[in-house]
């Protein structure tokens, strides 16, 4: 049974919801799924004033534990079109894993949350994937196999590179049913591909 880590950062709960949906999908594919988050870097007083969701069910991950998993689903909140500093800081601490080749040939997929439709989702997906490629990880995209991303009748997350969601600048828009379904689809796809590689 493939061991999948869903690792995310979420300020207001949007990516937390996407991570839970992706975990459900991975579980449907028969994977042993663990959901964890990266540590918050914003001082607590500042985070509380900004109404961050500081109490989240997922435990805090440590960088070196990534070696224990077969595949990964990364949930990324963006800042100015890039991955958040919280996830970047976490990945910057994985140097020992890189030096030992511990993540080589392990599948990974990425989802992104932005405040606006044009807030850099595709750039954040690509730049996060670049960091994972330095580890030799195998990138598993959402792809157009998930047809729910097509159409322009409403605000609709998704890109061939990974699932996306838009929160609005005040955080008032939570992931839609279509976006949560896309996250579930992406999680299941990652788990199915991982299972084929760990046989």
Swiss-Prot record:
FMN binds at residues 10-15, 78-80, 113-119, 134. Keywords: Flavoprotein, FMN, NAD, NADP, Nucleotide-binding, Oxidoreductase. Binds 1 FMN per monomer. One of its GO terms (cellular component) is membrane. PANTHER family: FLAVODOXIN-RELATED PROTEIN WRBA-RELATED, FLAVOPROTEIN-LIKE PROTEIN YCP4-RELATED. Belongs to the WrbA family. PROSITE patterns: FLAVODOXIN_LIKE. SUPFAM superfamilies: Flavoproteins (SSF52218). Residues 155-175 are annotated as: Disordered. InterPro entries: Flavodoxin/NO_synth, Flavoprotein-like_sf, Flavoprotein_WrbA-like, FMN_Rdtase-like_dom, NQO. NAD(+) binds at residue 12. NCBIfam families: flav_wrbA, PRK03767.1. Its EC number is 1.6.5.2. Pfam families: FMN_red. GO terms for molecular function: flavin adenine dinucleotide binding; FMN binding; NAD binding; NADH:ubiquinone reductase (non-electrogenic) activity; NADP binding; NADPH dehydrogenase (quinone) activity. This is NAD(P)H dehydrogenase (quinone). Its cofactor is FMN. It comes from the Bacteria. It catalyses: a quinone + NADH + H(+) = a quinol + NAD(+); a quinone + NADPH + H(+) = a quinol + NADP(+). Residues 4-190 form the Flavodoxin-like domain.
């Amino acid at each position: 049974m493939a061991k999948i880590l869903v690792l995310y950062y979420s300020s207001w709960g949007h990516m937390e919801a996407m991570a839970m949906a992706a975990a459900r999908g991975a579980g449907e594919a028969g994977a042993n799924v663990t959901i964890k988050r990266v540590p918050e870097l914003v001082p607590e007083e500042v985070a509380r004033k900004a109404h961050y969701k500081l109490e989240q069910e997922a435990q805090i991950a440590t960088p070196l534990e990534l070696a224990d998993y077969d595949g990964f689903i990364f949930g990324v909140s963006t800042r100015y079109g890039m991955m958040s500093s919280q996830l970047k800081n976490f990945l910057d601490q994985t140097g020992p894993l890189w030096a030992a080749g511990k993540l080589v040939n392990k599948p990974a997929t990425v989802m992104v949350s932005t405040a606006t439709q044009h807030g850099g989702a595709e750039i954040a997906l690509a730049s996060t994937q670049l960091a994972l490629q330095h580890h030799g990880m195998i990138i598993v995209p959402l792809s157009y196999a998930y047809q729910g991303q097509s159409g322009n009748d409403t605000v609709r997350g998704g890109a061939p590179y990974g699932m996306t969601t838009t929160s609005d600048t005040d955080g008032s828009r939570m992931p839609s049913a279509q976006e949560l379904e896309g996250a579930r689809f992406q999680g299941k796809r990652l788990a199915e591909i991982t299972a084929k590689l760990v046989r």
